[in-house]
Amino acid sequence: MLLDRALPCLLICAAASAHAASAAAPPVRIILVGDSTMASSTGYGDALCARFSPETACINLARGGRSSGSFRAEGRWDEVEALLRAPAGFNATYVLIQFGHNDQPGKPGRSTDLVHEFPANLARYVNEARALGAVPVLVTPLTRRSFRGAWVQDDLAPWSAAVRRVATATEAPLVDLNRLSMADVQAIGPARADALARAGANFDHTHLGPAGAARVAATMTGALLRAAPPLARVLGSAR
């Protein structure tokens, strides 16, 4: 009889203890580093941040028009390093790094050499993030939604391949967003792909409106959970 009465109490106490332990666990921090396809208003970064649990710090430092070279040259990587150096009490910090669009030729002051400079820049970001205790995650560039006939054009393939090679060489987690987003855009076709863009005068085949940001954030969520399984406790559907 006493055991029968005590068992519910034990179960309740155990559940409360587990909840308290979970609540007391140090939070996770996410830092986004990249270009306009990840940045606020034009990319998926904020929509991705909304998919993390409320106690997770998600900081979107991606900026439009930046390449793997100009992001550092402008001092923006210094902001990332300052965050990583400051005592913050996080259980883990993940730095998502996505470049490629503005590293392509024809962008004065931003373009980088694909063979040497671009991969060296990425590897340096990975190594410096690790040296400061963070987990770097490399992300291949989001596809452009440009079709030739019935087929989406893979004009970022060489830069995506370079990102994959750096991820292999540095043993960094990889999200192959280029491959995933290309497959998605190909599957839905040109008309539905156009609905992912910003409306009106801001329309183009690169940047994202709200629907596009939400769709890419959902793709990123699944890919991140595969690339970095510990994020499962803080990453889910949009809140």
Regions found by a protein language model. Give the residues of each.
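Conserved phosphate-coordination/catalytic loops
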Residues: 71-75, 116
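Catalytic-site microenvironment of enzymes
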Residues: 239
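Bacterial N-terminal signal peptides that target proteins for export
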Residues: 1-8
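Alpha-helical cap/lid subdomain in secreted, periplasmic
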Residues: 79-214, 218-236
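Bacterial N-terminal signal peptides
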Residues: 8-16
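Serine-esterase "nucleophile elbow" of acetyl-processing enzymes
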Residues: 19-70, 78-90
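Short N-terminal or domain-adjacent regulatory/targeting segments
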Residues: 2, 13, 21-22
